[in-house]
Structures are given as structure tokens and as C-alpha cells.
Amino acid sequence: MINPIAFQIGPFAIRWYAICILSGLILAVYLARKEAPRKKIKPDDIIDFILIAFPLAIVGARLYYVAFEWSYYSKQPFIEIFITWHGGLAIYGGLITGALVLYFFSRSKFINTLDFLDIAAPGVMIAQSIGRWGNFINQEAYGAAVKSLNYLPDFIRQQMYIDGAYRQPTFLYESTWNLLGFILILFLRRKPKFLKQGDITAFYLIWYGCGRMIIEGMRTDSLYFMGLRVSQWLSALLIILGVVLVIYQHRKKDTPYYYTSLETEKKNA
């Protein structure tokens, strides 16, 4: 089994989970800063946004998890709510918080919210792909017991042997799904005559929503509300929002193309 602690710095334990999250964050920031000028967004605005959004997203991810596991946390010492290294960060809580921060931040900077979402979506997708490996090392976000995992490398099989049985590596399914989504976004961005403002955001919503809805049904650690898997309902909502956004943006006569600002700059140069 892989030790969840990567190394120690004095009394502080640096966990693989944190390394995975930070690695995804750094890559997401790099990608967004690289794309920002094409949307006439200052790269420094990306840094300013992350400094606000990232800590709040962690808080949101934790509060979301605690809220839906209140039957457990209500019986624990209050300090347990703040001990995130025991597990319990829900990605949907982080996404919702991050989206709210992005909306208000973009308005305060007079940036079109869809433009900001479009440049953020690819980085979020790949960051989620990397972050799932933190779940792997923590032995969480897995599925039901299976007879064998012989089709996987030894290190994954060994880590997925939990409570006396091999488990469906749902973390791997979602990580792979998000990686494919990221690659497809890069391909879509090469189609300037087709892509419109908001299309990348819509693709993210639909792609992630579809994958998460299916994979969530395989997991054994889902959060429930009134007997229903919360993440599946939210996934369905993402899909609906994505479809509505595509239809709305493509029916609007004045919706700019994704690269309109870039092409205009080239013509005026």
C-alpha cells in the first residue's frame, strides 16, 4: 500500500493528496494564463482570481461534504470538521464555490463571465484528472468489490485491495474521462469558425456531467440526500445547463465566436 504521506518537513506531514491538488492547480493556472490574452484578459487577473478562489473552493468543498454527512459529524468533536486530511472534500462543493467567486470576480474586473469560464474550463478538467490520483492514494472514491483487477498495473491493484477485496477503481475511470475531455477541448479550440463564446464551458458541463453521472453510480461512498445520490442529480443539472447554453448562444445572432477578439487584433495589426 502506498503511504499517503509523501514526506515530512519537521512536524508537518506533506500528503500526496495535497501534492495532487496543487499540481493540478499549477497546471490549470498555467493553461489559463496562456489562453487569457486571446480573450483580452490580463494573465495577472488569473493569479488574482486563484488567490481568492482556491482557498474558498477548499472551504466550499469541505462544507458541502460535512453538510451531507452531518449525521456523522454531528456526533464527532467539533474540531473534526476542520480535519480535512481524514478525508472529505467534495468536488461539487469546490466547483460551486469557485463558479460563484468567478462570477463576482469577473464582474468586478469588467470581464465577460463566459470568456473567463471558457479559459478556465480546460484547466479545471485536467486538474480534476490529476486530483483523482489523490483519492487513489487515500484509498477513497472507489467502487464495489470485484473478483480481480488483472487488467491493471500492480501498483493500482494493490492500492485497490481494500477491506479484503479488490474494488472498482472509479477514481481511474473519472481521471481518464476528464483527461479525454481535456484533449477534446484542445481539439475544439482549433475550430475557430465553429466555436462560439461559451461553447468550451458548455462542453465541460456536458462532458463532466455525463461522466460523473455514470461513474457516481458505481461508487460506494456517495453522498445521499433523501435517499438519492446528490452528485448524480447535480450531474444531470450540469448536462441540462450545458445543452441550454449551447442552444442559447448559437441562436443568438450577436454571439461572438471564441476567437473573434484575436482575429480582430490580427486584422487591425
UniProtKB/Swiss-Prot annotation:
Topology term for the membrane: Multi-pass membrane protein
Pathways per UniProt: Protein modification; lipoprotein biosynthesis (diacylglyceryl transfer)
UniProt EC number: 2.5.1.145
UniProt cross-references to Pfam families, sorted A to Z: LGT (PF01790)
InterPro entries attached to this UniProt entry: Lgt
GO cellular component, one term: plasma membrane
Positions with a binding annotation for a 1,2-diacyl-sn-glycero-3-phospho-(1'-sn-glycerol): R132
GO biological process: lipoprotein biosynthetic process
The entry's keywords: Cell membrane, Membrane, Transferase, Transmembrane, Transmembrane helix
Signal peptide: none
Entry's transmembrane regions: 9-29, 46-66, 81-101, 110-130, 168-188, 198-218, 227-247
Entry's Gene Ontology molecular function annotations: phosphatidylglycerol-prolipoprotein diacylglyceryl transferase activity
Family: Belongs to the Lgt family.
Name of the protein in question: Phosphatidylglycerol--prolipoprotein diacylglyceryl transferase
Species whose genome carries this gene: Streptococcus gordonii (strain Challis / ATCC 35105 / BCRC 15272 / CH1 / DL1 / V288)
